[in-house]
Amino acid sequence: MAQVRLAGKQEEIEQLIRSFEQHYDVSYTSKEYGRTNPKYKYSKDSRVYLELKLKSAKIEK
């Protein structure tokens, strides 16, 4: 399992999450951190925390 913090524009974050889903199981996605924390209320970037697990490789016989 890996924990990752992403920061950037919302569209960029969504694209990254979709690309992660090709090779990883995204088990947790937090709310946008920039919107819920008053310290970052006026920041243009948002932050999201993810938990990732490797997808198990399926062996075909």
Swiss-Prot record:
<protein>
    <recommendedName>
        <fullName>Uncharacterized protein YvzF</fullName>
    </recommendedName>
</protein>
<dbReference type="Pfam" id="PF13113">
    <property type="entry name" value="DUF3970"/>
</dbReference>
<dbReference type="InterPro" id="IPR025088">
    <property type="entry name" value="DUF3970"/>
</dbReference>
